[in-house]
Each structure stands twice: as C-alpha cells, then as structure tokens.
C-alpha cells in the first residue's frame, strides 16, 4: 500500500518547504502563486511533484492535488505541518488494521495556536461531529474519492 501527501501552500520556496516538512512519502505540492509551471524532484527517495498555480483558495488547492493523486492512500497537508518520523508507516498500518475504512483521521502535532481535537481511540466520525477535525488529519483511499467524485466545496473558505 502506498501513500501520497497532498500539500497546499501559498507563495512558498517549495524545495526548502518540502525539506522542512519532513515529507516521508511521494508528494503532490500545490503552490498558489503568481505563475503557472510544474517542477519535479526526488527528496530522500520520494518523488515530489510541484504545481505552481496562479489561483487562490485552499479548497481549490486541495481539489487540484486530489485530482492528480494516484497512490492507494492520500493525506491532506498544509505548509506549516512537520511530520514526525514514522508518520507514514503509522497511517498505512491504520488502513491495514481497518480495511473497512475509506477515510481515517490521525492526530498531527501542530503549533499551539492551531491545536484542535485530539483522538485517543478509534471511533466512527459522523456528519454532526466531523467539523471539529482539520483537513490535515484526513487520510483516505484515493480510489474511493475519485470513484465518488468527492471534492472540497469552493463555496466557502477553509477547505
């Protein structure tokens, strides 16, 4: 099983950003800026595909990354997330332990100002409590998202 990280960023120097984030998997990085171009490189054995796009909106950025995702699993991320060593392996293990799940939420250590809900055990998330979880905690089966044509709404901010 292979995981791909989908990063949304705004006006970043992408090579230093990718290094800082400690990306431990192939990555699609959407950098919203003032130009349209593509670049690709390898970092620590992982393919980084970067799309510089002259557009704005985090939902649009996540949708662009999701459309290009081609791994078994994908994990949404923001430019200020720094992954602990072993994070990718733990996410893959979570899906192996729960083959019935199309999406799993994972705790991600973030700056105190961004701290949000913290899960202490496995449970099903429902429509009435899903809003408490940040997008960067979502890992999902890419094929299921593509099969159901699921995307982020562009009608309001925040992704």
Q: Where are the language model's segments positioned?
A:
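Conserved short acidic donor-positioning loop in nucleotide-sugar-dependent glycosyltransferases
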Residues: 30-35, 56
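Short aromatic/hydrophobic "clamp" motif used to bind/position activated sugar donors
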Residues: 74
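Active-site acidic Asp-centered loop
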Residues: 32, 77-80
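Conserved donor NDP-sugar-binding/catalytic core segment of glycosyltransferases
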Residues: 82-118
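A recurrent flexible, glycine/aromatic-enriched loop bordering the glycosyltransferase active site
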Residues: 123-143, 155-158
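Acidic helix N-cap motif at the loop->helix transition within catalytic regions
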Residues: 14-18, 35-46, 86
